């Protein structure tokens, strides 16, 4: 157990092995989630999810690298010019950016149905997972990955069962004009 904890501590540090592991995990986990979405022929698939997760992990690694450099290698220069960093800004910008990508997957059909929300949410979750991977928060990453897969694979069946047993009904009606609307509602 002690050796395992030492190994995990080593992988949380900033070194070549840690960076390689984090980027590989981001690529694999993002791709695996995207594969499931692509199998269902959704707007974003294998490569999109892989790139979102990988990009988020890279951003977090860059954030950590900058923080380290400003407090170590660049410390004297940073102090001389009064340079301050806020490592949370990198992650925040990933979340902002993913909003635009997610918005591109959402459409309203001719029947006024909204489609693509799960894809947009999945891209957002994949980006968040990438940030956690980049930070080396492996326990969170593994649990998050499993829960994202569970949400995408198992919960649609639960959702369908709930909808089928519900007593509610959705009726879609389109009107050319509103002339007789009062008669129809009455």
Short names for language-model regions:
Residues 6-24, 131-133, 138-151:
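Hydrophobic alpha-helical transmembrane segments of small proteolipidic membrane proteins, enriched
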Residues 39-52, 86-95, 109-124:
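Short, non-helical or kinked segments that cap or interrupt transmembrane helices
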């Amino acid at each position: 157990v002690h050796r395992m904890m030492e190994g995990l501590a080593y992988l949380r540090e900033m070194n070549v092995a840690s960076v390689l592991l984090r980027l590989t995990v981001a690529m694999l986990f993002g791709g695996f989630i995207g594969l499931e979405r692509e199998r269902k022929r959704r707007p974003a698939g294998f490569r999109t999810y892989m790139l979102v997760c990988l990009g988020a992990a890279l951003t977090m690694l860059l954030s950590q690298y900058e923080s380290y450099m400003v407090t170590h290698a660049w410390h004297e220069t940073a102090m001389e010019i009064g340079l301050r960093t806020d490592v949370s800004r990198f992650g925040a910008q990933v979340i902002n950016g993913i909003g635009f990508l997610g918005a591109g997957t959402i459409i309203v059909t001719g029947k006024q149905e909204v489609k693509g929300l799960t894809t947009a949410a999945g891209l957002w979750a994949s980006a968040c997972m990438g940030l956690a991977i980049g930070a080396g928060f492996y326990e969170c990453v593994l649990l998050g990955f499993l829960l994202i897969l569970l949400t995408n694979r198992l919960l649609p069946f639960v959702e369908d069962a709930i909808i089928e047993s519900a007593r509610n009904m959705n009726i879609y009606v389109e009107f050319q004009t509103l002339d007789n609307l009062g008669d129809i509602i009455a």
